[in-house]
Amino acid sequence: MSPHTEGPLFAVLKNSRARPRPRESRLRRRVHKQMNISPTPKRYNSRGYEFPRSNDEAFHPFNREPPMVPSERILPEEYRVNSQMINKLIKQNKDLTQQLDRKQDEIDRLNVLVGSLRGKLIKYTELNKKLEQAAAGARQSSPDDVLQVNRTRPREPPAGGTRLDDRLSDLYSKLETLTELVVGSAAADRGARDHVHVPSAGATRTPSSGASVSHRPLQPGAASEDDILTQESAELKGLEDQIDLLKRKLLIKRENELRKLSLNKELLDLMEKLDVSRPAGPVPSSSTPPHCDQCHKAAYQTAAANGGHGVPAGAGSGAGAGASMPSPRNPPYMSMAQVLETPTPAHRSSHKPNDTLW
């Protein structure tokens, strides 16, 4: 079909709203007349008569459609190349967009990891600072201890060294005085018991040991100042312990002496109350000699002459009155009271050394 047949009339007929052409209607009427067929004018027009073409709206120039463009045309090669390049660029753009999205996701994950690591770094840095400050504070304010001093090592001896030496010398002198007192009391006891004024071996050893302790040399050049102060502190502690021990020993000894005296007095009182017919010997002690028959008879004769009650003359005056009696070797008998009795302590000399400790 030619392009002229596909005009506005064809479109009107296709829409079933246009009327057939007048020429065709005339031809059909002729055919109907020849064939003796009644015409059907309503099929072609509503009014039943022919109207001019100029009045037909279908043929109006404003109602005509433009001629249809053929569907297939030969395009230039540049169009095809351009379309291919555009398609390639679009695909490449999509790939780059996807790759960029993946990289952005990876960057987000790395940012989260960096944030967590930064927080941990800040936390551990603060903890490290706190620990360093605590360590510095502990080093600066260390607790006072006898064996711990500041780590100052001056080349010249400190000014407080003389005061420390004075204190040491005072402690050593007090220790020597106390040692001599203890040794003198022990020597007096042994001398009164044995009637021999010979210093014992312990008495000779104790001052030497005290002197060795008191005059033990310190070697400041061989060790550091901390070691020297530590050694001196240990020595002072040992001396204080020795002094406390000697004090306790002296106190126990004095208590024992007082107890012995009270027991001896109580025993003498009991013997006086018994008023036994047989005369009892004197109470044995460290300062009285053993029993003697002759001396005992003489003492009782003197007591009878003076009007006594059978008690020896030396028994009433204390345990030290029997020191002038002669001492026989073997006593004839020994009572149970004499067996259980402890020796009486010796009399101390009136010249007592000055005790500076108490």
From Swiss-Prot:
Ranges in a coiled coil: 82-140, 226-275
Pfam families assigned: Spc42p (PF11544)
Organism superkingdom: Eukaryota
Biased composition (Gly residues): 310-321
Bias-annotated ranges (Basic residues): 16-33
An annotated GO cellular component: nucleus
Compositional bias ranges of the Polar residues kind: 203-212
Record key words, sorted: Coiled coil, Cytoplasm, Cytoskeleton, Nucleus
Matches recorded under InterPro entries: Spc42
Localization of this protein: Nucleus; Cytoplasm, Cytoskeleton, Microtubule organizing center, Spindle pole body
Disulfide bond annotation, renumbered to this chain: none
Residue numbers spanned by region Disordered: 1-43, 135-166, 189-226, 310-358
Residue intervals passing through the bilayer: none
Function of the molecule: Forms a polymeric layer at the periphery of the spindle pole body (SPB) central plaque which has an essential function during SPB duplication and may facilitate attachment of the SPB to the nuclear membrane.
Family: Belongs to the SPC42 family.
UniProt name for this protein: Spindle pole body component SPC42
Organism: Lachancea thermotolerans (strain ATCC 56472 / CBS 6340 / NRRL Y-8284)
